[in-house]
Regions:
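N-terminal glycine-rich phosphate-binding loop for ADP-containing cofactors
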Residues: 1-175
């Protein structure tokens, strides 16, 4: 769960910074990144109250480490009662059967999609590398957990190897 936090956290930051809307972020991560669900779609499925509680618990468990801090956006969603599919409203709106209502069209600018993927992957890879460095699990176990446990399209450390550590460090340095 700790390694997966940036999937939500960095996506929310991209939204809060005004770089892209939620539909575009979800679209980029699904179509370019190969993820089965976008982060906002997934938070709505899990329940924004549940996701916020898990995020807060991880933050508290790591002694309020800033990188795990819950966002104000998450908090406001919970306070508003916009918990996702179960309430018919979350980051997206849903009909009475829990199906997504018609939403806006995502931006299809390829450079924006790549920018989103690079940021989210860099943060995910950084978290996986930190877990590896601290001896939490082996490289193989981390990648197995992310592909089989969280259903990511690739293991994060295998993904990191495709472009190399220097590439991902460069992405992190400009964030």
């Amino acid at each position: 769960n700790r390694v997966a936090r940036p999937y939500y956290g960095e996506s929310i930051r991209i939204f809060e910074e005004g770089i892209a809307d939620m539909i575009t972020i979800d679209h980029a991560l699904k179509t370019i990144g190969g993820f089965r669900m976008g982060p906002f779609e997934l938070m709505d499925l899990i329940g924004n109250d549940i996701n916020f509680t898990v995020t807060r618990t991880v933050w508290e468990s790591f002694f309020y480490e800033p990188r795990y801090r819950p966002s104000f956006t998450q908090q406001r969603m919970v306070e508003a009662g916009w918990l996702g599919r179960k309430t018919g409203r979350g980051y997206f709106t849903y009909d009475e059967k829990g199906q997504p209502a018609a939403n806006a069209v995502p931006s299809i600018a390829p450079e924006l999609g790549e920018r989103i993927i690079e940021r989210v992957l860099a943060m995910l890879i950084n978290e996986a590398a930190d877990a590896l460095n601290l001896g939490v699990a082996s490289k193989e176990d981390i990648d197995l957990a992310m592909t089989k446990g969280v259903n990511y399209p690739k293991g994060l450390l295998a993904w990191a190897d495709e472009k190399g550590a220097a590439h991902w460090l460069g992405v992190l340095e400009v964030l």
